[in-house]
Amino acid sequence: MPSISGSFSGKITQQFGMPMTDQPNHLLGIAEVNGTQKSSDPLWNDSRISYWGINDLLNGEGTQTGYFNNVHPDGGRDFGTFEGKVSGAGGTMTVEGTFKFTGGDGQYSGITGGGTFKTVAKSETEIEATWTGAYELAKAQAG
C-alpha cells in the first residue's frame, strides 16, 4: 500500500451545539469543515475535503466521530469515517484519531486503507489538520 501524508487548513462552515442537562458542562455538537488538501501524493494534492464531525464533550473533553469526503482534481472522490479523542488542554481544542476509507468513485472506487490524523482549532471557525496513512486503489489490488 502506498503511504500518504498531508495537511489542510479548514473553515467551519456550519456548526450546532446542544447543551445536555444530564450533567454539568455536557455538550453534543456537530460541525461541517471544508478545506483544500496539500500532499506530496499528486492524487491527493489539491483535493477538496469536507467532513462532518460529531462531538460528545464533558468539560471540553470527549470524543469526535464523523464522515469525510474528498473530491480529487481528476473528478473522482473517496470517502470514509473517522473517530478521535477531543482534548482542551492548554485552552486549545485538539482532536487526534484514526480514519478509514469506506469507498469512492472514479479511480477511487474500491479504495482501502486509512491512517491517523490530528486537528488543532486555530479560532472559532478555523482548524489546521495533519494526517498520515496508506491506501490501495482497487486497480492495484486486482493487478
Question: What does each model-identified segment do?
Answer:
Residues 1-143:
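Beta-strand-enriched cores of mature, soluble protein domains
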